[in-house]
């Protein structure tokens, strides 16, 4: 299906084009981005949740952010971002959503306006 396809509306439109009535009996989302229903983890008890379990079953954050622009930060840029300060990147285009990586690790998500990075969220993963 195409992004932003409204199945209920599509069903109603199809029914109207057939000069009939129609409705959706059952609708189930099976995928959102890279997340698929068949990859869902079923947990029967909290005892199952161990560090090894989480490391084995988790999707790496880099895989989730794979289709979003990433910029690599220098030491100075990373320090400024950690302190909540704006910093300038050598990137000309304005970007409404991107992530910044430092030493291969997610540092922050935010936007870029006139080469100035504005953090939306800074992570403490380093």
From Swiss-Prot:
Q: Which SUPFAM superfamilies match?
A: Pseudouridine synthase
Q: Please report a single Pfam family linked to this protein.
A: TruB_C_2
Superkingdom of the source species: Bacteria
Share an example GO biological-process annotation for this protein.
RNA processing
GO molecular function: any one? pseudouridine synthase activity
This protein's name: Uncharacterized protein RP502
